Regions:
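Catalytic-core helical/loop segments in enzymes performing group transfer/polymerization on anionic/lipid-linked
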Residues: 1-298
């Protein structure tokens, strides 16, 4: 039997011998009767249990990740520093991987001799925010499922799909595009608004120049109001960066040697913990690894 992971990997023509991993594999307008694997979220109690498990995993790994990143960057920062910086991504990533992992584990136990086609490459996000943009994309989830299968001992017969075009598609999806409507909005009212904003922009520019050389924090995942309070408490100048910093993957050299390393060198007894240990460095956003030094000096 063939296993389809998302709507992206619809490689199989014989639908009678096809198992869909979940409802997400089916187009909402498709009326065919597909063989769909059961969902692991059967009730609210199961959701609570999964959340508690993910929190324990997060609590275990945050200190280990802190030690690893300190070592890689020749720093001696506290666990709290790294938790503020990468904690939101780590929590997000553990929850996402655990959800996909449980779906795969259910089908691997229930069905035998499953054949699956996975991506031959990995997709690494440039920034944490990219994960939010991409997590609803089938193409990105296909990479997540593929990485889990590569790094866990499921009883699957594995084929590989050449995935360069999927990488290009996700990169192009993240690049900003000006729609026709936006272009047409450049009129007198728009120019007047821009003119009125000039004094505020100048003041913010001065703040930005000063703050970039004095502030301790950059690109923290928290609301603007909390940013203001934090800077005030630290006697630092609050500013807003209006420009979006875009560093697409195709312009950054991925450090494959470091990303091949594990967070801890010893084998972990808990199977999911061992999976996360294998995946973390290879999937951490570029801003926290290859671009960490660049970002911390801004």
């Amino acid at each position: 039997m063939k296993l389809q992971l998302t709507s992206t990997d619809n490689f199989y023509k014989d639908e009678s011998n096809l198992l869909l991993l979940g409802e997400w594999c089916v187009n909402i307008n498709d009326k065919k009767n597909y063989n769909i694997a059961p969902n692991h979220y059967s009730n609210l109690e199961e959701v609570t249990k999964n959340s508690e498990f993910c929190y324990k995993a997060f609590d275990f790994f945050i200190s280990k990740v802190s030690d690893k990143l300190n070592k890689l960057n020749n720093k001696n920062y506290s666990n709290r520093y790294w938790e503020i910086l990468i904690g939101p991504w780590l929590w997000f990533y553990i929850c996402v991987v655990y959800d996909r992992y449980k779906s795969l584990r259910i089908v691997s136990k229930k069905y035998k001799d499953l054949e699956v086609t996975i991506a031959d490459k990995n997709y690494v996000c440039s920034k944490f925010v990219d994960n939010y943009y991409l997590i609803q994309k089938h193409e990105y989830n296909y990479f997540i499922f593929s990485e889990i299968i590569k790094n866990y001992n499921f009883d699957f017969q594995i084929n590989f799909h050449q995935s360069d075009n999927l990488v290009k598609y996700l990169n192009s999806f993240l690049l900003p595009k000006l729609s026709k409507k936006i272009k047409q909005k450049i009129n007198y009212i728009y120019l007047l608004k821009k003119f009125i904003k000039i004094p505020f922009t100048v003041i913010n520019f001065i703040k930005l120049k000063y703050a970039k050389s004095h502030n301790n924090f950059i690109n923290i995942n928290m609301p603007v109001g909390l940013h203001k309070k934090l800077y005030r408490k630290l006697n630092q100048v609050f500013y807003q960066e209006y420009r979006s910093i875009i560093i697409p993957n195709l312009y950054v050299k991925i450090d494959t040697k470091i990303r091949a390393e594990k967070i801890v060198s010893y084998k972990l007894d808990q199977p999911f913990y061992e999976l996360i240990n294998n995946l973390l460095l290879n999937n951490i956003p570029i801003e926290y690894l290859e671009n960490y030094k660049l970002n911390s000096e801004c």
